[in-house]
Amino acid sequence: LLLIATACQTVNYPDVIHLEGGKLHIQGIALDKKENCLYSSFTSAFFKSDLEGNIIGSVTGINGHLGAMTYDEKTKTVYASLEIKDDEIGRGVSDALGAERHKKAASRFYIAEIDVRKIDRLEVPFEEVMKLHAIDEVAKDYLDTVVVNGQALEHKYGCSGMDGVAIAPSFGTKSKEKYLYVAYGIYGDTTRVDNDYNILLCFKMDDLKNPVHKYFVKTGNTRYGVQNMTYDKAS
């Protein structure tokens, strides 16, 4: 008689992690299971903390809206959305920082590629750890004026920028290749119909500037679209 015993390791994560230090609201979080640390964005700053809320390091100097994020265990990299824009949200961030407001024509949107291994102290300048990939497709839709039912409207598709970020396989295939997905923010406005879709851009991991797919998911009117998203391997 052969008896085989196996043990399952259960990790108990805290129900609450109390974290302070940002001037604005927390927007995105990502968990590093191997290092037992949490990455979080406080809109204009990025924090690295342990699971008890003790801050290990931070990244500052961001005059923009650092939003949702995802963590790639293989490359030790956080990918986050970054908006630099002129709307109510953009003005609020600049005002809170005492910084100059952005002009509409200068509004830009980026995927921030963050090397978390370099965050080893407080107030690391963002230029030392972040590589920014400009997403022209989002900027174009944000700046465009369209005619809907004979009325000229700002922001094509109701695009307010971008927020949700996730790493996942391609839709409809069994390939193991991973892609980075970024979701548009969508202004809520029930008087128009071109904003009844949530929009996802799909990027190859080695080319975060040029989307390979642009998906339109009809959901009806939403307020700011997809704020956060993740991939469920079990579904």
Q: How should these model regions be labeled?
A:
Residues 14-19, 117-162, 204-224:
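Surface-exposed loop and turn segments in beta-propeller and other repeat-based domains
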Residues 14-44, 163, 169-172:
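Beta-strand-rich domains and repeat architectures in extracellular enzymes and scaffolds
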Residues 23-30, 63-72, 137-145, 157-170, ...:
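Repeated scaffold domains used in trafficking and secretory/extracellular systems
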Residues 31-35, 71-75, 169-176, 231-234:
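Residue-level detector of Asp-centered blade-edge/turn motifs that repeat once per structural unit
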Residues 32-62, 207-208:
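Beta-propeller domains
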Residues 52-99:
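Blade-loop segments of beta-propeller domains
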Residues 93-121, 193-208:
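Beta-propeller blade signature
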Residues 151-217:
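Hydrophobic, aromatic-enriched interface-forming segments
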